[in-house]
Amino acid sequence: DVTVVASPWNFPVAIPVGGVAAALAAGSAVILKPAPPAKRCAAELVAAFHEAGIPKDLVALAPLEDGDVSRYLVTHEAVDRVVLTGSYDTARLFRSWKPDMHLLGETSGKNAIIVTPSADPDLAVRDVVHSAFAHAGQKCSASSLLVLVGSAGKSARIARQLVDAAASLRVGGPASLDSQVGPVVVPDDEKAVRGLTTLGEGEHWVLKPRYLGDGLWTPGIRAGVVPGSEFHLTEYFAPVLGVMRVDTLEEAIEVVNEVDYGLTSGLHTLDTEELALWLEGIEAGNLYVNLGITGAIVRRQPFGGWKRSAIGSTTKAGGPSYLLGLGEVQAAPEGAAAPEAAHSTPTLAPRVRALCDAVRDQLSAAELAELRRAVAADASAWESDYGANRDVTGMACERNILRYRATPVLLRAGDGTALADVARVLAAGLLAGGPIGVSVAQELPAPLMSVLLAAGVEVSVEDARAWESRLATVSNSGGLGMRVRILGPREEASAQRWDRATRASWGSPDVALYTGAV
């Protein structure tokens, strides 16, 4: 097994360490392909792995410039998967080279902080300025949008403090120990330069950025950013912040969610009702309340996003599920010991219980027993992990809560799929509670159809050609964050389903495909 870790330049050590270590832990050899500006850091990192005892044939360095040779590496038939930290455009480029690439990505972010009238203005300004301009705005988690709600958008105090705080930051090279804003690493990046120099319609500078040479820019703040504008929707790796004004928190949430990305997001408020509304409605992977939105810490704040900020079957880096994306689930051999949870008798959700009852007469005794063990294990995992908000750090000064959110899922059961497998996957989907669509090659039993219709699950009977046409439409029409679970005959290799699905979806990075065994 071979994994290519394609790491960025903005975290030249921490991110590749995480990717390489995770791939090794999952049992894969690793080729580290760093971004060109970070090649020297990557060389030292690989040497450290070797000095620690990792064999040289398990961790290799490919210090390549971007171009044909890099393309040859990531598309090589011997590479089983690519772990990318970079832009969404890079993920799309990789998939255009090889549509069936197993690509796991943490990609772009267009991140915002919302400030409501109830916020502490001093604390809010401090966190906005740090989140926008530290590292010269070159963290994928950096905030390039400030959304002011109601009277906060008319506050002379907030406006004055924001401009004063940003203007007072010390700009300088890395050799200056007092530098607070360093150089733009790729100074000729067209998008970054545009963000620092070109205003959109109705926008104006309240703090105009200045170029000092050697890649150094003073911070810039533009006001008058409107929904749907380029600055509202585009990620800029540069020290520039755009200010938007809305009347209500509901409008602010809508404005933030209009962006195709969902990496980090922040809220400054002292109102618990506002906090509850925001937590329920905002679409981002890492949420920060009355804090800056950068600087996630492994385990305490595992890192990863929604929509176009996450590619493939990846989960949060530094979190408890990260290794799951680096392997494939396989059915346990017959007679293997079942997990302890499978022997417990947790309370089943009513919909799950109804599903089991609906297929009881269509399954063999062995299949029914296996389904019951599976849903019991699901229920136990739901109670302890997936359905519970957990703070594993237990810090006295702050709460770090890990929660799971249901996302839309499209299930396809092709010709020859066992009903037991369909029931098992549907049981998990009904428990999670997210929107489910089902495509089947053969009609499902009437009792099962009744349960699904009562649960609001749309079921379509379609042949392979109709299904592939549907998958192509879903994959290329903005179905951001969609999960597609594809089942087939148990004797069929998951790689065959993967190949068919990636061809049908044209390698779109906007959907995550799951084709493994049940």
Residue map of PLM features:
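Short gly/Ser/Thr-rich phosphate-binding loop of adenylate-forming enzymes
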Residues: 84-96
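A short helix->loop->beta-strand "cap" motif at the edges of active sites that frequently abuts
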Residues: 28, 98-102, 434, 504
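Extended, low-polarity segments enriched in aliphatic/aromatic residues
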Residues: 39-52, 447-451
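A short hydrophobic/small-residue beta-strand
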Residues: 24, 29-31, 436
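Conserved short alpha-helical elements in the N-terminal third of ANL/AMP-binding
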Residues: 19-26, 427-431
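Conserved C-terminal structural/oligomerization subdomain of aldehyde/semialdehyde dehydrogenase
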Residues: 4, 10, 53-56, 71, ...
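Extended low-complexity, polyampholyte segments enriched in Ser/Thr/Pro and acidic residues
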Residues: 138-141
